[in-house]
Swiss-Prot record:
Main function: Single strand-specific metallo-endoribonuclease involved in late-stage 70S ribosome quality control and in maturation of the 3' terminus of the 16S rRNA.
Its EC number(s): 3.1.-.-
Upper lineage: Bacteria, Pseudomonadati, Pseudomonadota, Alphaproteobacteria, Hyphomicrobiales
Cofactor: Zn(2+)
Domain of life: Bacteria
Gene Ontology CC: cytoplasm
Location relative to the cell: Cytoplasm
Pfam families: YbeY
Assigned keywords, A-Z: Cytoplasm, Endonuclease, Hydrolase, Metal-binding, Nuclease, Ribosome biogenesis, rRNA processing, Zinc
BP term (GO), one: rRNA processing
Residues reported to bind Zn(2+): 126, 130, 136
Protein name, UniProt field: Endoribonuclease YbeY
Amino acid sequence: MVEGEASSPAFTIDYAVATGDWPAEDVLRGLVERAVTAAAARTDGPLQASLSVLFTDDAEMRALNARFRGKDKPTNVLSFPAPDSMVPPGTPRHFGDIALGYETVSREAKEEGKSFEHHLTHLVVHGFLHLAGHDHETEVEAEEMEQLEREILQSLAIGDPYA
């Protein structure tokens, strides 16, 4: 497992590459920093916070999805918002954790004719928006979240992921 830390203007980002054929650490770090910085600029999240990102494989994503969502199948991204009650007074808030599954991310990018990096950036943005309280349980919520994703990705020169 490769672990490290990076900082965006408002976030300290801890990352871990557990398993999977992920790009090099510096590529992942740059991608996550750009995605988080762009998404944070468009949300009402905290001014300072920490965030953890786990790059793993479908086996671990399946286990996490089963444990926390009751769905016994792998998924591309999972988000785990940190409760505010976990923050000791005077310390930066831990915003939450994002986990990404390599095989699903890779397969989806190929099936949808997208670059792996663009699809991964989209999923980091998507996961971050979940941490910020956005959801897509209803059609209205989904439309609002997807539009926000489009705007954030456009600011990163990435095309509409839903086109």
